Regions:
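C-terminal binding/interaction regions
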Residues: 2-4, 89, 94-152
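Glycine-rich phosphate/diphosphate-binding loop of Rossmann-like nucleotide-binding domains
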Residues: 3-54
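Structural motif
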Residues: 16, 49, 73-77, 109-115
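Generic secondary-structure signature for well-ordered alpha-helical cores
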Residues: 24, 36-44, 64-71, 101-105, ...
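Amphipathic, non-transmembrane alpha-helical secondary structure
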Residues: 28, 32, 60-64, 136, ...
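Amphipathic alpha-helical hairpins
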Residues: 35, 39-40, 47-71, 87, ...
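Glycine-rich phosphate-binding loop
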Residues: 58, 62-100
Length: 152
């Protein structure tokens, strides 16, 4: 009997994880979650590139540059933006989201948006690994979008 099997979602794909160094404890959990999800999906470890940037604000510029190389299929963006006492939180969160949306609209790579905007460290912990891991979710989304963009 012949069996048709779908190849793993990540097989043959090259993926970058662009992660902020700010809020390292939380982002570190997300990086591990993203990496594990990519490996489980069939992405080879050698096909995963980790790029660290200072903070969330810097992610879109690096994601755009990576997309423009034509060497990657997907970019997973990871950061935690923690609300403070000033408007800075909103500026950084909005700039990061808008910048990544612009990269996504280019249609060159699948984008996984794993940028958490939280009010407290506890909320960050819950979303970065204790109860769920948004890094894993962002990685799976990036792979799905990469496959979809390739198929169109």
């Amino acid at each position: 009997m012949r069996e048709l099997r779908e190849r793993p979602l990540g097989a043959g794909l090259r993926v970058a994880i662009v992660a902020a160094r700010y809020n390292e404890m939380l982002v570190g959990h997300m990086i591990e979650g993203a990496r594990e999800a990519l490996l489980e999906a069939g992405v080879k470890d050698d096909d995963i590139l980790l790029v660290r940037v200072p903070g969330a604000f810097e992610i879109p510029a690096v994601a755009r540059r990576l997309a423009d190389t034509g060497q990657l299929h997907a970019v997973v963006a990871l950061a935690v933006v923690l609300r403070g006492e000033t408007y800075h939180f909103q500026v950084v969160a909005d700039a990061c989201a808008e910048g990544l949306q612009q990269v996504a609209l280019q249609g060159k790579v699948g984008i996984g948006f794993g940028v958490l905007t939280v009010d407290t460290v506890e909320q960050g912990l819950a979303r970065a690994g204790l109860k769920q891991n948004k890094g894993e979710e962002a990685a799976r989304t990036a792979l799905e979008m990469a496959r979809l963009l390739t198929a169109i």
